[in-house]
């Protein structure tokens, strides 16, 4: 976890916590968090992907922690007078540091939220759950669903199925892996690339590909399907499972 040690002259000088600061009036919490990380730690924010937001409401003002992960190692170093040093700290070692009181009070909730969530979508099953004429043009129907999921990936979700052991996060930004099979594999992806959406075109059985992903994908996994046999295979692999209705209600 990337942490900064505050300069001695600042509030709680010498304490450790995540980079951050005040949000400008025109900024979202995401823009503010990434800007502060860049200004204080020289972090290349183009290399990280946001996966959640956790709020701490103090009645009159709110502290929001934006959670993000980097798919590859990235460098960071102190570039602000407010920062004495920065370090990548193993999660198990965080509690041993002298932490900023606000961060220390949130650490248990933050630690539970560090693991990103991947939603694995059985597109054939979801597509078959809504009667929009998909049987006349499977590739076209798959394209419509992909476009809608891309929007959802960008806006995030505020509710997860009860089957997911979720932390107290205000908004999740999962990774989506959408599995296509058969005629649906001809569907084109969204016109605008979305870093949280990946299309997996199954070479063989779509169910086999979904079960493989459920077992091999790191972090929390949520499989969206109503297929009983596939649900059992995914649950046996350690993934959570929900039916298509959860996803369709969000689109």
Residue ranges of predicted features:
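Nuclease catalytic cores that cleave nucleic-acid phosphodiester bonds
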Residues: 116, 121, 127-251
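Short histidine-centered catalytic/ligand-binding loop motif
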Residues: 16-26, 134
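Short, charged/polar surface micro-motifs in flexible loops or helix N-caps
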Residues: 1, 9-10, 24, 69-74, ...
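N-terminal strand-loop-strand
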Residues: 1-18, 45, 49
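Short secondary-structure boundary/capping segments
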Residues: 8, 55-58, 77-80, 168, ...
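Anionic group-transfer/hydrolysis microenvironments
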Residues: 6-7, 92, 124, 183
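Unchanged
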Residues: 22-115
């Amino acid at each position: 976890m990337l942490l900064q040690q505050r300069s001695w002259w600042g509030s709680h000088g010498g304490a450790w916590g995540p980079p951050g600061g005040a949000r400008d009036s025109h900024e979202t919490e995401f823009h503010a968090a990434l800007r502060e990380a860049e200004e204080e730690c020289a972090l290349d924010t183009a290399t990280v992907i946001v996966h959640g937001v956790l709020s701490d409401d103090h009645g009159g003002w709110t502290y929001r922690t934006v959670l993000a992960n980097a798919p590859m190692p990235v460098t960071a170093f102190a570039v602000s007078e407010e920062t004495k040093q920065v370090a990548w700290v193993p999660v198990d070692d965080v509690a041993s540091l002298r932490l900023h009181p606000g961060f220390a009070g949130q650490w248990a909730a933050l630690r539970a939220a560090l693991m990103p969530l991947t939603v694995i979508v059985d597109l054939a099953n979801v597509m078959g759950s809504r009667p929009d004429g998909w049987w006349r043009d499977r590739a076209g129907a798959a394209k419509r669903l992909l476009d809608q999921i891309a929007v959802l990936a960008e806006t995030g979700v505020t509710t997860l199925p009860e089957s997911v052991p979720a932390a107290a996060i205000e908004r999740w930004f999962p990774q989506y892996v959408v599995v296509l099979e058969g005629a649906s594999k001809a569907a084109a992806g969204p016109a605008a690339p979305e870093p949280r959406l990946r299309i997996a075109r199954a070479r063989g059985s779509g169910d086999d590909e979904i079960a493989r992903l459920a077992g091999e994908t790191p972090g929390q996994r949520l499989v969206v399907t109503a297929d009983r046999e596939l649900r059992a295979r995914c649950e046996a692999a350690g993934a959570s499972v929900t039916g298509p209705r959860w996803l369709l209600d969000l689109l």
